[in-house]
Amino acid sequence: QPVVILLGWAGCQDRYLAKYSAIYSQKGCTVIRYTAPWRMIFFSETCGIRSLQTPAKRLLELLFDYSIENRPVLFHVFSNGGVMLYRYILEMLHSHKPFKDLKVAGTIFDSAPGRRNLKGAVRAFATVLMSMNVLLKYFLLFAFATTAAVLRILLYPLTRFIHKSHYDFLLQAPSRWPELYLYSQADAIIKASEVKYMADARQQLGVSVKAVDFAYSPHVSHMRAYPTYYSSLCMTFLSDCL
């Protein structure tokens, strides 16, 4: 049976990710769930600190710890928070000896990936900080927006040589297994045009790509809006990849 690795969006609670687990566990798949801490996603990554490499490596090591490294693996990646982690997983799958032999069946992207969209990133961060003290919330939002604007937008022509963005890395990623993109024109955080651009670029590299526009569902809410259709898309994709 396949192993499915779910990489949650920034601020995602495990109980939400568990609903996606059920799609696969009901079919007998082994499911691993992980969401990176928001501090790593919004600050470490923005500053070019590769702190997400550690959980990325640990997730792949789990396959060996549980002796399931010979099973096909499907990645289900949510928003840019999941994509940032997936980027390091991809790097290790192609550069670290024990991981090179893993059999990746495919990758599903839900509401991702997005480019350097500062407005969308600030909206996402504001959602994560919703329950926080108002003064601290606005201080963190200001600090993040300022850092991101300087390092990831204004200075990116220079900083990309040190730390390429996750989006630019994925455009030329060496992986060639099938990819499914689930996105929406109504997404206020990740632009549909950026997801479509990525899907088209990957297809031009010879990757088997399918892209589905849900049109009206908000960011990471496609399954909530269309549960039966969403589950069917995921299971059909997994079946086609095996």
Regions found by a protein language model. Give the residues of each.
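Catalytic nucleophile-loop/oxyanion-hole region of alpha/beta-hydrolase
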Residues: R39-S67
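Serine-hydrolase catalytic core
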Residues: L141-M235, D240
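Conserved alpha/beta-hydrolase fold motif
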Residues: V73-S79, T107, Y181
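Active-site nucleophile loop of the alpha/beta-hydrolase fold
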Residues: V104-N117
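Active-site loop/turn elements of alpha/beta-hydrolase fold enzymes
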Residues: A36-W38, A112, F214-Y216
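Short, surface-exposed "cap/lid" segments of acyl-processing enzymes
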Residues: Q1-I41, Q185
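Short, surface-exposed alpha-helical segments at coil->helix boundaries
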Residues: A18, Q53, A192-K196
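Short glycine-enriched nucleophile-adjacent loop
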Residues: L85-S95, T107
